[in-house]
Amino acid sequence: RIPFEKIYRSFTRDQYEQSRLERLRARFRYWTANFDLAFGFTDATTDTTNLSTALELRRNKKRLDFFFGGYYWFRSTKESGESRVTDENRLLGRARLNLDLSDRTFAFSQLTAEYDEIQNLSLRADQAAGIGYRFVDREKLMISGRSGPGYVYQRYFGGENDNYFTILFGGNLEAELPYGSKFRWGAEYLPEVSDWQDTYLIRTFADWALPINGWLDFKIAAINIYNSQPEEDTENNSFTTTAGLSFRF
């Protein structure tokens, strides 16, 4: 007999034999993936173009939980008789590996990298490793926190660097809601060890997905990044929201 908790997907023999997609899902049963796409265009006195894409991969097998996400945002505007202006051009990637040490405790290692033209950020890369704990671990609700030492590397256009050692404090929430919808929230606080009151970075992610059919969701997502020491002539805060479609694999 196969324990119920080890059953990740079920389908009939005919479904398996007639569908290449089902065979792939069986072979990669520990993996989930989604591709998100949002697009907007306005043709008026002020023309606007918006594009947002994301690719997320996750492999969750007992003891090991791996996540990778790649995200891109672009927005431009054009006034009548003027040249087109880029308002947002940002690329972000993040990866994290959790290793269960007990039912609730886990070790983690993570890496985040970001490019932001509007914030004059050529590259920000930060990595951290440490210990985490699941405060709530139910079938439809998971709340966890984690902390550990790390390093933040920041290079701005023009060659200026701003690097520091940090201790990461992070948290995540995942919840299954009515109608099959899902909500995710995550936050990270990365202060400089030697100047934690004045130099720090705060990142917050959130998204809500509502199923349309077996492979397509409607998704609303938001990201907020606050840098207490931004480059000259740029704002501390960078906030973006998107609404579009999410294709599940």
Question: Which residues are covered by each model-predicted region?
Answer:
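Compositionally biased alpha-helical segments
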Residues: 1-42, 47-48, 52-56
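Residues that define the transmembrane beta-barrel architecture of outer-membrane proteins
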Residues: 47-51, 87-91, 123-127, 141, ...
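Transmembrane beta-strands of outer-membrane beta-barrel pores
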Residues: 39-43, 61, 72-76, 113-117, ...
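Outer-membrane beta-barrel domain signature
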Residues: 22-26, 40-46, 80-86, 116-122, ...
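Detector for outer-membrane/organellar transmembrane beta-barrel domains
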Residues: 140-191
